[in-house]
């Protein structure tokens, strides 16, 4: 296996759209430069990896968090679909990009292109600090929303291994410093969801303190990354005509729980480089299993590992997912109905 990592532009240098940039572009597009960097890197790997012992017909892309969102976007972009043989996404999925028009208005507020080009790069970077530059439907890298492409089955039709962690978010992000009581939880959900609060509370109930913590953590996780990742898996399973393998990573790192990014050291096999934690034999066992599953998927498109529990494809609505922990096992996801409610509300209000 040959591993390639690539850098790409971020922030104002990676996603700044401006009407004057659009006008001078041969593709009549601006913004998404960081994603175009990734396409260029992918094309370079395709053109050159044979010289390093790799196979250009067997390129699997992977990423975590924003990197996972990038994997999703590369799968749906017309610029990169034909370069991909497989994909791995960890804790990041379907997003709702801005329109090019709104991204251009955001950029135009910074001034004219001539004024910006007259500034040193360091000044531009400093002035842009604190501003958000979104991925946009620019008509070139993205021609429509990722959900639309996935719903129509127009994405790269390749095997997909995708999942998220058990504690991507915390109930404290909903309740803040308030005690996790049912009344405070219901009030917080009411403030956030208004007329939809009853539907959310039925899906994520909080009838006692323990349930408030569990449902609040699930809701916060869904709002952060889990829902978008789940939606990616469901849409790809429905339309992609290739197997989709879904996981939920639940191994706690120290006493934090399976927080966002906790799986990275396990998946990449570099626990020993992080000396903050007193890793145990159980941690090593989780890491070994995760590395084997991921490596075999990269090589074959199927994470079947002799001696480990079978990881079934998740191409049916009630298909099981792999729980990655000290003792890997499959479960039918209990959270799926709650996620479906939240997704339907998001879709309703996006119209």
List each language-model region with its residue ranges.
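Serine-hydrolase-like catalytic core of hydrolytic proteins
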Residues: 1-113, 140-141, 147-175, 241, ...
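Short, solvent-exposed turn/loop segments enriched in Gly/Ser/Thr/Pro and often Arg
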Residues: 9-11, 62-66, 247-255, 309-315
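A structural signal for well-ordered alpha-helical segments within the folded catalytic domains
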Residues: 36-43, 69, 105, 226-230, ...
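Surface-exposed helix-capping loop/turn segments at secondary-structure junctions
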Residues: 49-58, 114-115, 234-245, 296-312
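Short glycine-biased active-site loop of nucleotidyltransferases that positions the nucleotide triphosphate
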Residues: 76-81, 255-259, 313-314
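Substrate-gating cap/lid region and adjacent catalytic-acid/histidine neighborhood
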Residues: 115-283, 293, 300
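Mature extracytoplasmic/periplasmic domains
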Residues: 304-332
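Tryptophan-rich aromatic "cage" segments
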Residues: 327-351
């Amino acid at each position: 296996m040959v591993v390639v990592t690539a850098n790409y532009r971020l922030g104002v240098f990676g996603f700044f759209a401006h009407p004057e940039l659009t006008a001078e572009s041969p593709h009549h597009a601006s913004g998404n430069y960081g994603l175009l960097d990734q396409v260029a890197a992918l094309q370079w790997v395709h053109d050159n990896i044979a010289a390093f012992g790799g196979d250009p017909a067997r390129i699997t892309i992977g990423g975590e968090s924003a990197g996972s969102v990038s994997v999703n976007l590369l799968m749906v972009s017309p610029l990169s679909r034909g370069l991909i043989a497989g994909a791995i996404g960890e804790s990041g999925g379907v997003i709702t990009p801005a329109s090019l028009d709104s991204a251009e208005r955001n950029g135009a507020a910074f001034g004219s292109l001539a004024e910006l080009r007259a500034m040193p790069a360091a000044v531009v970077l400093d002035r842009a600090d604190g501003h958000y530059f979104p991925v946009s439907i620019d008509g070139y890298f993205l021609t429509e929303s990722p959900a639309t492409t996935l719903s129509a089955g127009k994405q790269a039709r390749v095997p997909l291994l995708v999942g998220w962690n058990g504690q991507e978010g915390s109930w404290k992000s909903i309740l803040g410093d308030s005690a996790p009581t049912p009344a405070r939880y219901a009030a917080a959900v009411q403030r956030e969801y208004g007329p939809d609060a009853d539907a959310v509370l039925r899906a994520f109930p909080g009838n006692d303190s323990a349930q408030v913590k569990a449902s609040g953590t699930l809701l916060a996780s869904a709002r952060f990354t889990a829902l978008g990742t789940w939606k990616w898996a469901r849409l790809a399973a429905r339309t992609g005509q290739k197997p989709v393998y879904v996981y939920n990573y639940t191994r706690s790192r120290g006493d934090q729980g399976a927080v966002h990014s906790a799986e990275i050291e396990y998946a990449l096999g570099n626990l020993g480089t992080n000396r903050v934690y007193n890793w145990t034999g159980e941690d090593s066992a989780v890491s070994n299993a995760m590395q084997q599953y991921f490596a075999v998927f990269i090589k074959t498109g199927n994470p079947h590992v002799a001696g480990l529990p079978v990881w079934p494809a998740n191409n049916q609505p009630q298909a099981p997912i792999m729980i990655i922990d000290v003792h890997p096992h499959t479960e039918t996801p209990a959270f799926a109905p709650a996620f479906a409610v939240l997704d339907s509300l998001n879709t309703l209000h996006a119209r």
